[in-house]
Amino acid sequence: MDVILMLNKRELAYWCVVNDRKLYLLDNAIPLLEKSELTFNTDSARVIGEYLDHPVYWLEANNCLHSDDFYTQRELLGIDQALFDLAGRATQLSHMLHTQSFCSVCGGAAVLADDQFAMVCQQCSNAQYPRVSPCIIVAVRKEDQILLAQHPRHKTGIYTVIAGFVEAGETLEQCVAREVEEETGIQVKNIRYFSSQPWAFPSNIMMAFLADYESGEINPDYEELSDAIWAKAAELPAIAPKGTIARVLIDETLALIKATKHVQNL
């Protein structure tokens, strides 16, 4: 992909303007504007993709934009997934720009390359690419119930599914089993891949799985969780919002439970 393009003043484009991992929003949306309508300098803009036949640009914010107009990407949950992911790409590239500005080999200053999304050392030419941390996320089913957990970091008190970072030398399936047992005391079986989602908080890739209960009683790790429960569809607490892979996993598990009940009733 060409990352630097000549901008046409009359061309409508989406502008992902980033400041401190937050995005510039107009009317709660990523701005779709012509360059001539913009009030800030766009010389450093990089094209990061296309959405609905319009280019999408990443741009670091400058001082002429009011800080009150910047919001976390969570404010965009529920918009079309393709545009949400492009906004995430912009925030991840911004994260790279600000956290990988020195070479990991020789310590020299690194700058953003002109021809790729990488930070290139000005002394030894080593290229550093955006760091992406692999994470698993899993919905566990026990007959007509789903395993849900509450985290202290969720100030709204929502319940979600189990997630965690993959360790070195570990398969994704091993990580699923380990994270579930470490956080809840539950052992699982029939672990199967479901889907994935880039998650720019700050720079993760969420790899989603479904699994079935095998054994054990819930015994939450209170360093990680504030609660863990088995919940039936009719008894769900507040859960992860739409637009998250966690919500997709919850909805899929509830659909599987409903389908199983339907077959049993035939």
Curated annotation (Swiss-Prot):
GO MF terms held by the record: magnesium ion binding; manganese ion binding; NAD+ diphosphatase activity; NADH pyrophosphatase activity; RNA NAD-cap (NMN-forming) hydrolase activity; zinc ion binding
Residues that, per the record, bind a divalent metal cation 2: E179
Entry-linked NCBIfam families: PRK00241.1
Record-given protein name: NAD-capped RNA hydrolase NudC
Binding locations of a divalent metal cation 3: E179, E183, E224
Domain Nudix hydrolase, first and last residues per copy: 130-253
Enzyme Commission number, as recorded: 3.6.1.-, 3.6.1.22
GO-annotated biological processes: NAD catabolic process; NADH metabolic process; NADP catabolic process
Chain's role: mRNA decapping enzyme that specifically removes the nicotinamide adenine dinucleotide (NAD) cap from a subset of mRNAs by hydrolyzing the diphosphate linkage to produce nicotinamide mononucleotide (NMN) and 5' monophosphate mRNA. The NAD-cap is present at the 5'-end of some mRNAs and stabilizes RNA against 5'-processing. Has preference for mRNAs with a 5'-end purine. Catalyzes the hydrolysis of a broad range of dinucleotide pyrophosphates.
Keywords carried by this UniProt record: Hydrolase, Magnesium, Manganese, Metal-binding, NAD, Zinc
Similarity comment: Belongs to the Nudix hydrolase family. NudC subfamily.
Reactions listed under catalytic activity: a 5'-end NAD(+)-phospho-ribonucleoside in mRNA + H2O = a 5'-end phospho-adenosine-phospho-ribonucleoside in mRNA + beta-nicotinamide D-ribonucleotide + 2 H(+); NAD(+) + H2O = beta-nicotinamide D-ribonucleotide + AMP + 2 H(+); NADH + H2O = reduced beta-nicotinamide D-ribonucleotide + AMP + 2 H(+)
Cofactor binding, per record: Divalent metal cations. Mg(2+) or Mn(2+). Binds 1 zinc ion per subunit.
Cellular component aspect of the GO annotation: cytosol
Gene name per UniProt: nudC
Cofactor section: Mg(2+); Mn(2+); Zn(2+)
Residue ranges annotated as motif Nudix box: 164-185
